[in-house]
Amino acid sequence: MNAPDGLQRCFVLHRRPYSESSLILDVFSEEFGRITLMSKGARSKRSNLKGALQPFTPLLLKWSGKGAMKTLRQAEPISLGLPLTGINLYSALYVNELIGRVLMQEVPMPGLFHDYLFALTELAQADNPEPALRRFELALLAAMGYGVDFLHCAGTGEPIDPQMTYRYREQKGFIASVRRDNLTFLGNELIAISERRFLTKEQLQAAKRFTRIALKPYLGGKPLKSRELFIQMRIPRTRSMEK
């Protein structure tokens, strides 16, 4: 994919040191999707980019190069970084890791970029991050072509009944079921997932179950680092509350 002619709206998903003064950036761009950039000299004392090339800071970036790793040529922060703290910060790190693990390099996804920006904005303001996370996971699955009909029974084609139980079958959809287990959902839960609107705790938990099932093949067996960090954060907090 050719390099852009002008500045592009981007977010840094992850950054790591390279050599004595440079950075390698995993970037999510509006028009080019995920790209890898080298920012030469970004860690030097004289660099004015040192504080700008951070996750959750809206950026305008320009780069050059044709290989897998491009060279950053220009960077301008659009605004200050989004105010993310505590559990909401760990939730945003999870979103970044999810994009980095699931999306292929250099596949344009402008719609998902807007969903990502909306998710970060929600997380910066939310008391409970769970609804924003579920909405983004569902948007990510849709962007990758993971099409699921939440509103019709895959066996009969009839509209989903809010009171009935349905079993999820991968690549088929939801089939009416009389048993309840981890792969079954109430009709009202499926309707809530379709509308991305979660009015009850049960609907939110059902959405989390579904996205875990759907994302598992993309994530493989490797655990998410952000989830491990979140668990480590919760353990000291729980112990202090017990004291």
Curated annotation (Swiss-Prot):
Domain of life: Bacteria
Gene3D superfamilies associated with the record: Nucleic acid-binding proteins, Recombination protein O, C-terminal domain
GO cellular component, one term: bacterial nucleoid
Disulfide linkage: none
Alphabetical UniProt keywords: DNA damage, DNA recombination, DNA repair
Function: Involved in DNA repair and RecF pathway recombination.
Protein family (similarity comment): Belongs to the RecO family.
Record's protein name: DNA repair protein RecO
Gene name of the record: recO
